[in-house]
């Protein structure tokens, strides 16, 4: 777990600790559902809209870059956490799945082919199905008195004595959600964006929650 009220820039690479549990992994389902008709987070009827050519090209590149991560062993070898034993996140709005982070990718850059997190759905047989990716950028703020720049980890929003450095990022033409507080103690405020490239989301490819899937009971 994270601790403290501010998170030095030099320690951003250890942000994945709150997500990480290392145990044996299981094979994954490699057959994605069709996602060709899904265009944006605001498309409630995805089949009625299509992606533009540039976004389509970018998403195709993302799929090519992450296809190997249907195999959980390949994801772990690439630096992502082992999903075994991690919680499957759901709510009345839908499901996100199991979040696994690659700590080496956690910084201020948004690289479309290198998402900071992968989202897996646990399967009844004990395996995992890759359903989405997540981009995450910590919020950096500057102390106006000292000039120090840190990732903000306090529960509440920074006050007048600080200036937010990190502005809302975007990927595939979609602005990230946030800033939002960390989901675990000490996890920084951040921006995030889900992209459901490996499963259909009736709420849109870039929505936070997917109501068409559910965590196993």
Each language-model region and where it sits:
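Residue-level signal for mature regions of secreted extracellular proteins and peptides
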Residues: 18-19, 81
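Primary mode marks residue(s) on the alpha4-beta5-alpha5 output face of response regulator receiver
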Residues: 33-217
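Sec-dependent signal peptide recognition
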Residues: 10-15
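Bacterial signal peptide processing site
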Residues: 26-29
